[in-house]
Regions:
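Active-site-proximal or metal-binding-adjacent scaffold patches in catalytic folds
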Residues: 1-223, 232-298
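Walker B catalytic acidic pair
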Residues: 228
Length: 298
């Protein structure tokens, strides 16, 4: 596959790609920017010219506009309900499984560009002894104090480091518990920050988990971890993989409900059986996968 950049007067950077396996010109519009700063890519069969891709783009302008508008609306809704992080400003807040993070703008007396993080419990001590996590009831409060001159990339970098610190603690603990409980052996866990996937498992048994997992409700966070652990026994997404993952997901939800998790209660129907009012339920692992896909990474 080879690629070329095209500067469109309306849409900005468009990535043109030639692919030997493509049989027709196709267009993809993503909700997040790619590494070139654009959101649109055009794939062209190897036998055609890049100009053929540009010509097809011209014909599909109205469709692209609609797609961009739909994604903009979707992104705005995602910010409102916490599934995405928009522009960071004074008062911006987001919840993780561990903490409520609030950004506070304060001028600095020294004139130096510095960011401070304050941490304090957000619940009564007796409430912090619960065994389950919830983004609706984080245990800690973290204030990120920043000056007016702070840039968006700078503030996002600070946020990423806060999430990384929480992910290293929580995800390492969770994967260790799951591995022991369900009989998995992995070599190494690495916490990653990327926008392409929530997790991955290598043939060597190394597991990567995205630091954004701490922003998901606990059943969804656990689903991703169990998904990657399942690949240690079932490398592909065949029937065996889905049977194993479904069993693990149901057992985990059952355990969360037993210890009082309010986020797990919505999946109680899958613990009681495979049907509701005579209708067969969609496999739980598929439901959890769809819900994870509605979240946006920082």
């Amino acid at each position: 596959m080879t690629e070329k950049l095209y500067e469109d007067p309306e849409f900005g950077i468009v990535v043109l790609r030639k692919n030997v396996r493509s049989r027709a010109v196709s267009i993809r519009v993503k909700g997040v920017q790619n590494k070139y700063g654009g959101r649109i890519s055009v794939t062209v069969p190897w036998s055609l010219r890049y100009q053929d891709g540009i010509n097809y783009l011209e014909k599909r302008r109205e469709w692209i506009r609609d797609a961009l508008n739909r994604q903009k609306k979707h992104s705005e809704n995602a910010v409102l309900d916490g599934r995405s992080v928009g522009v960071i400003a004074d008062g911006t807040s987001l919840n993780t499984l561990i903490s409520k993070i609030i950004f506070i703008e304060q001028p600095t007396m020294s004139g130096q560009l510095s960011v401070k993080i304050r941490t304090a419990p957000s619940e009564y001590p007796e409430a912090m002894s619960r065994l389950w996590y919830s983004i609706d009831r984080p245990m800690m409060l973290k204030q990120i104090i920043f000056p007016p001159e702070a840039s968006q990339p700078g503030l996002r970098k600070v946020l990423v480091e806060v999430l990384r610190e929480e992910a290293k603690m929580l995800l390492d603990m969770k994967i260790s518990i799951f591995a022991e409980r369900y009989g998995f052996q992995y070599r190494k866990l690495t916490i990653k920050h990327n926008s392409s996937n929530w997790g991955s498992c290598s043939r060597a048994g190394n597991i990567n988990l995205n630091l954004n997992l701490v922003r998901l409700p606990e059943p969804l966070c656990d689903y991703v971890i169990l998904h990657e652990l399942s690949h240690l026994k079932e490398p592909n997404h065949g029937p065996g993989f889905h049977i194993l993952l479904e069993r693990l997901c149901r057992d985990n939800i059952k355990g969360l409900i037993a210890i009082g998790s309010t986020d797990a209660e919505k999946y109680k129907a899958w613990i009681d059986g495979d049907t509701v009012s005579g209708k067969t339920l969609t496999p739980l692992n598929e439901v959890l996968s769809r819900e994870v896909s509605s979240w946006r990474m920082v």
